[in-house]
Amino acid sequence: MLRRKIQTYLSRSHIRRGLCGLRFFQTQRLHTDYMPIEAYEPYKNELKSKIGKDFIIDLSYKSGTASLFEACVYNGDFLRSKQLLKSFIDHNKGDKILLPMINLYIREIIQRGSFELTDVLSNAKELLQQARLNGDSLTYALLCQASLNPTQRQLGLPVLHELIHNWRSANGKVIDILMHESVFSPEEVKLIMDQLNIPINNFTPSQLQLLGITNSTIVGESENGKDQNGDSSLKEKQPDVETTVTKSANLNALRSSLSSLLTESIDLPIDEVSLEFGNQGDTFNLARQKLLEKSAILSAAEVWKSEHESVLNRGNLQVPKNVSSLFYSWYVQLEQLFKEEISLIDDLALNESLDKKNDRLIYGPFLKLLSSKKLAALTIMEVAQLSTNPRYDRGARVTTLLGGLGRSFEREFLSEQIQRQEKNKSYKDKKRLKELFNDPRKFRQAVKNLRLSNTRDNIVLNPSVDSWPSAIVMKVGSVALCLLLSVAKIEVTAKDLSTGGILKQEVAAFVHTYQYSNGRKVGMIVPHVEFYKLLSRDIEKPHLHPQLLPMLVTPKPWTSWIDGGYYYSRQPLVRLKGALEQVDYLMKASENGQLDELFKAVSSLGKVSWRINQRLFNVLIRIWNSGEKFLSIPPREVKCDMPPYPKNSINPRDKVIWHTRRKELAALKTGAHSQRCDFNYKLEIARAFLNEKFYFPHSLDFRGRAYPLSSHLHHVSNDVCRGLLEFSTGKPLGPKGLNWLKVHLANLFGISKKDFATRQAFVDDNMQEVFDSADRPLDGNKWWSKADDPFQALAACFEIAEAVRSGDHESYISHIPIQQDGTCNGLQHYAALGGDIEGAKQVNLWPSDHPSDVYEAVAEIVRGFLKKDAEAGDEMANFLKDKVTRSVVKPTVMTNVYGVTYVGARKQISEKLENIDGMEKLKVADYANYLTKKVFEALRSLFTQAHEIQDWLSACCNLITHSLPADYIKEGIKDELTPVVWTTLLNLPIVQPYRNYKSRQIRTNLQTVFIEERDRTATVQPHKQATAFPPNFIHSLDATHMFMTCLKCSEQNINFAAVHDSYWTHACDVDQMNSLLREAFVLLHSNNIMERLKQEFEERYKGFLVSKKAIKANDEDLKAKFGNKSYIPLEFPPLPARGALDLKKVLESKYFFS
């Protein structure tokens, strides 16, 4: 079979076909209201020499050499970067993608400040001539800016006139040069207009707004008493923010740094899209948020220093058992080691006789992008955060740590670049920006021009996401981790058994070791147990990265696939995890303006303001300080009674059992410490944000599901986090609000399958327990602790007690989010897709006086099967027939629609059977096997049409993944290259990422690691694609439904938050939200989704041929129709027949979400 190297090449000026063999962009919409983005077909090119292909420019991803070029440019190493640039030019002459690289090179020379204009001009001319290209408007803008430099003014003004003359001679427009707001300030624009005698009236008012030309700019005056970025009111004394009394220096130092904004004159550029006007507090909080993001890393080091000095002042000269002080001792040594490493890198770069393949020449330019201070602080913060993640309670893989460290350095570098770019933005005038916000037409035009400008300035001027190659990330991370391991020491104490005294010894805080996982030897970094104890001891965590925290202001609205959320960190709208194809689709959909509604919806989720529930926080502090285990809160110390070593035993098995038990207890203890550290993180964040209003920026997974970008404390987390969080904006309960609070509390006790009246009565009957819980949460009956979600229940008890005792509950201001959950939401979508009336009734799409319980319905069918088998003499059926409850089948029913495998379902049922009285442990596996088959059989009988749709989706996926474009087959390319791609109703393109990526061996300072090469040319995994497609498709539907509901609520000024298929709002707005979410569901499914999907597949994969082996049909029939051909035209099977369900019935179903 002919094998070819497939080089993906995305042309900016030509339409090419996609990797899946598809035309990339449609010239017309498939449908009237949504636009599927199609894929690229590979640009087939003969394999070039090993050196040559390194320098082929590829827009779809950045090669290691391209990233190295950028790193050298940003480091000011213009000699090496020019050498690399010339190499690119030699292999890509005439290709316009060279222009952004040339522009970046010119821009960095200019922005360094010290340059000769003649050198800049000659450099630009030389590079452009070698590349056989003409400069674009950005090239001319940069050169014009250089000519305006005060040190070059005598020579510069004639050059300016010549540049503009040349640009006009090439039929260019001056406005195209001036519109590069990242290059010119308004004053520079005005100076150019004056020099060229361009009348103001040549520009439209909208263009003048975007150029930054205001009346004050024209007159040349600045308003007295006002800051350039806003009015004098910003300078006025702001009200003090109430602080929380605490031992930690972390918050005090942070608040100290923030308070400087009250008294000092600080220029804070105002973001062109994000700032809401009319509230001084918003402006102040924006300043605090930006300061937090910009300076928190180095502020952490200051906190560590403060704590360390405090310990020394107390006269304790030993190694201190205090997190901050310990970190500072590491930080000081680590910073020095980074300085020495950077010095070695600089020396090596000057020594031309050394081996050019030396690793320092490869990773050095990247390491130098950050200061040694930041490198040291980030290294400690990143390793500490991973160490406290419960997933790594037995240690973290070296590859995970190296990747995390390297990516954290890259993110910080991107953050610095964003801060730098902000200084050059033209939207610095708050008054002018306010005019844009007050004129919707001008604002829309401004956003459009910004989008065009971003495209015009190109990706090299704005470093892309994950642009550092994986090999570089690993090498940089390895350097940092090796340096940390050499300095990270911790003091441990032990009792001297001979003297009874205390022994102290300094040991490594982290150990590099190896463990076996699935038969493979894996490098691990294991923290010392004393380090875990230290982290979990106090509420003191000065190592939280600002990019992991909630925000003090409304997050930056999403305006493109790569621009939104935090202000000084860049993350994509969709969490890509190296899925390059998803980037391709997402980027083009964003550029085409097709994601505007999705941007609006994700931004709306971020606009919801939150606060900490102070009453619940106080309860948690009491529990935490007690050090005892309570519900899900881990204890301070885990007591593990280790049996004595059987040294006198003659049975070797006794010693094996003892060692096994020892490992189990050690793992238990380490896991408990890790969980306490994780809980400590959450509590620390809550403490820091007491008395604050804050927000959660959101992003999506590849299926479109929304998640907060913030880590640890957010509403998608556990019961404790959800209980701690409430809406910062309160609303009166109104006539029905108290009843909804009662329904909410009953749901938290697991009484969610009763009618609303019964749920309300449950709370009324236990009202004295509610009062007792609110008054004496830890000293009373603790009735709240018996709830399924106890901490949320306690928060609800506080709210209900206060509302009832207020005397006027309708006027009581409520902050608690009321949760309305779908009934096995995946099955709801399947029932609507298939028009399944019986299925619809089971999942509350059909109106009823009481909610249906699908889990009980399945359990009843299973019991019927078992009774029948028992009557036939089956022993297992006879034992199980009276023991199968809804709780036994619930996990399998919930996950069946999301693709749970038989093995996964059997494990779920095994765990339930183990708790049944009389069940012998040795028989669990056999009984679980038997029962799993019966549950699957029951589900198929109850949801026939849902399974028919699942089968159709899997069959289509199987055909797609075994298909290729006809021209590929002719050329002998028969690899399985085609993934499944579809488009949601909100125009989000979804590409399934399951491919057979090859591993690449990377040698680092610490050890050899293996990383996946995320390559578009990797073959797909047909089985994984097929099994994952049905659940992924349903996930994309429930995400679309959530966003449609979000948009409707936003239009009605209703606070809306969501955890997938659980929708939250104020108690007074529950009825209205329920009405809107029903309308959104009907609207979604009125679009004939399955027919649309089939049409999209037929258009997307038009002209494809599929392997005959992939088609489940009679061989004789295929042979008669196609002869002996191995590949035949791709045809999709007909859709399953749809039932007679009237979707409008959903509008009448009050238990649809409840």
Curated annotation (Swiss-Prot):
UniProt xrefs under Pfam families: RNA_pol, RPOL_N
EC number: 2.7.7.6
Targeting presequence: 1-30
Function, in words: DNA-dependent RNA polymerase catalyzes the transcription of DNA into RNA using the four ribonucleoside triphosphates as substrates. Combines in the mitochondrion with mitochondrial transcription factor mtf1 as a holoenzyme to recognize and initiate transcription at the core mitochondrial promoters.
Annotated spans, Disordered: 221-243
UniProt feature, compositional bias: Basic and acidic residues: 223-240
GO biological process: mitochondrial transcription; transcription initiation at mitochondrial promoter
Enzyme class: transferase
Gene Ontology molecular function terms on file: DNA-directed RNA polymerase activity; mitochondrial promoter sequence-specific DNA binding
Keywords: DNA-directed RNA polymerase, Mitochondrion, Nucleotidyltransferase, Transcription, Transferase, Transit peptide
PANTHER family in the cross-refs: DNA-DIRECTED RNA POLYMERASE, MITOCHONDRIAL
Record family assignment: Belongs to the phage and mitochondrial RNA polymerase family.
Entry-linked SUPFAM superfamilies: DNA/RNA polymerases
The protein, known as: DNA-directed RNA polymerase, mitochondrial
InterPro entries per record: DNA-dir_Rpol_C_phage-type, DNA-dir_Rpol_phage-type, DNA/RNA_pol_sf, RNA_POL_N_sf, RPOL_N
Active site: 821, 890, 1061
Primary localization: mitochondrion
Subcellular location: Mitochondrion
Native organism: Schizosaccharomyces pombe (strain 972 / ATCC 24843)
Reaction(s) catalysed (UniProt annotation): RNA(n) + a ribonucleoside 5'-triphosphate = RNA(n+1) + diphosphate
Annotated GO CC locations: cytoplasm; cytosol; mitochondrial DNA-directed RNA polymerase complex; mitochondrial matrix; mitochondrion
